[in-house]
From Swiss-Prot:
Name of the molecule in the record: Tektin-1
InterPro entries associated with the record: Tektin-like, Tektins
Region (Disordered): 396-426
Gene Ontology BP, a term: flagellated sperm motility
Keyword annotations: Cell projection, Cilium, Coiled coil, Cytoplasm, Cytoskeleton, Flagellum, Microtubule, Ubl conjugation
Organism whose genome encodes this protein: Canis lupus familiaris
Function: Microtubule inner protein (MIP) part of the dynein-decorated doublet microtubules (DMTs) in cilia and flagellar axoneme. Forms filamentous polymers in the walls of ciliary and flagellar microtubules.
Lineage summary: Eukaryota, Metazoa, Chordata, Craniata, Vertebrata
Similarity section: Belongs to the tektin family.
Subcellular location: Cytoplasm, Cytoskeleton, Cilium axoneme; Cytoplasm, Cytoskeleton, Flagellum axoneme
Length: 426
């Protein structure tokens, strides 16, 4: 216990001075290190603050550039979308024109088919495969060909409209994404250190698995623009093709319609001329029948007129047989009477032969009269079919020039383009 209460050892004055100096030196060294750290920290703070400001400024510039780039592509997409929409609307109008053109061909085809059916009702020798029938068959063939061509063209237009709508969908989807991206980047660009709602986010510095490179991003939008351009150019080419097809087919149909009308006119002219000639021959035959009938009457009278002289001659011969004895002489009178009887019989025979020939000729003339009358009726029937039924019906043909038949012309007329600033009319 006495050891525990012993006083602490005392230091020498030199030790006290040395200890104080050591404290001074340590304090000075510590302070010096601290000052250097403070200076270094301040320099570091200034450097980091400057770097941060520069980095944030650079990010702001990059965001601004990005916004401009997205706005540029958004405008490109907007322009292409507007052009594509206008072109598609034009194609829809052209599709309607083709449908109207196809519909308007039904009546001309029906008229042509009815004309062929009517002309099948011609009778006799007039049921001929003439130029009119050839032109009608050609007209039906032309109409069928035009309808097939218009149908194929309408299928092409329908397919092009589908492709345009596909390109339009891609543009709209791209535009929608770019609008969202613009909104997001615009919000990011407007943020600053004092903005409310800024916060820390865990694992923010990462590469999104579905993200794309800048080159892929550019290629994506550029592909959409190029596809829209390609479909628009294809649409413009198709519109020009439709205009040419409608114009050319209208000319072909109208030309063939004129050929049929001309054939009808020439056919009617020829048939009327044949009818008139037949009627003239019929009149001559009927006149000849009257002459032949008169001739037969004359011949019959001549035969009857020979009965008197024949009876006289026979009576004389019979009476002279009663002469007595030697007076029953074959004298000159007797020979002359015998000769007279023969002459009369011969003349009557000749007259009867002429009468028989006249009867044969009269029968032939009567048959010819009936044949000519039938042929005139055949020609009248043909004229009725061609002029009254066919020609009259063809006056309502929409393919004819002039008149009120403007249905085909309206269907085939070019439609002003919306891209030219004009309204669509059909």
């Amino acid at each position: 216990m006495a050891k525990l209460l012993q006083p602490s050892p005392k230091f020498l004055p030199e030790e006290w001075h040395i200890a104080n100096k050591n404290q001074y030196h340590r304090a000075e060294a510590q302070r010096s290190r601290s000052e250097r750290l403070v200076a270094e920290s301040q320099r570091l703070v200034d450097e980091i603050e400057k770097t941060t400001r520069k980095s944030q400024s650079d990010v702001n510039k990059k965001l601004e550039q990005r916004l401009e780039e997205v706005r540029f592509w958004k405008k490109e997409l907007d322009d292409k979308l507007e052009q594509l929409v206008c072109t598609t609307e034009d194609l829809l109008t052209y599709q309607t024109r083709l449908q109207n053109a196809l519909e308007s061909l039904k009546e001309p085809l029906h008229i042509t088919q009815m004309c062929l059916e009517y002309r099948d009702k011609r009778i006799g020798i007039d049921l001929v495969h003439d130029e009119v029938e050839q032109e009608l068959l050609k007209e039906a063939e032309v109409i069928h060909g035009v309808m097939a061509l218009l149908t194929r063209t309408m299928d092409e237009v329908t397919e092009q409209i589908r492709l345009n709508r596909s390109a339009k969908y891609n543009l709209e989807k791209d535009l929608k994404d770019k609008f969202v991206a613009l909104t997001i980047d615009d919000v990011c660009f407007s943020l600053n250190n004092n903005s409310p709602g800024i916060y820390y986010s865990d694992s923010v510095v990462r590469v999104e698995p579905h993200s794309v490179s800048l080159e892929d991003w550019l290629d994506f939008s550029n592909t959409n623009v190029e596809k829209a351009n390609r479909q628009r150019n294809n649409s413009l080419a198709l519109k020009a093709l439709v205009d040419r097809i409608l114009s050319q087919t209208a000319d072909d149909l109208r030309r063939q319609c004129d050929m049929v009308d001309t054939a009808f006119q020439m056919g009617l002219k020829e048939t009327k001329a044949a009818r008139d000639q037949l009627a003239a021959h019929l009149a001559k035959v009927m006149e000849e029948i009257a002459c032949q009938e008169k001739n037969m009457t004359v011949l019959e009278k001549a035969i009857l007129d020979q009965e008197g002289p024949a009876k006289v001659a026979h009576t004389r011969l019979e009476t002279r047989t009663r002469r007595p004895n030697v007076e029953l002489c074959r004298d000159v009178a007797q020979y002359r009477l015998v000769k007279e009887v023969g002459e009369i019989a011969q003349n009557v025979g000749r007259l009867k032969e002429a009468l028989a020939q006249a009867q044969v000729e009269l029968k032939g003339l009567n048959r010819r009269q009936l044949a000519l009358q039938e042929e005139v009726q055949v020609k009248e029937n043909t004229i009725y079919i061609d002029r009254v039924l066919c020609t009259h019906m063809r006056k309502s043909n929409p393919l004819r020039d002039g008149g009120d038949q403007g249905q085909w012309a309206r269907a085939c007329a070019p439609t002003p383009s919306a891209e030219d600033g004009t309204s669509h009319t059909d």
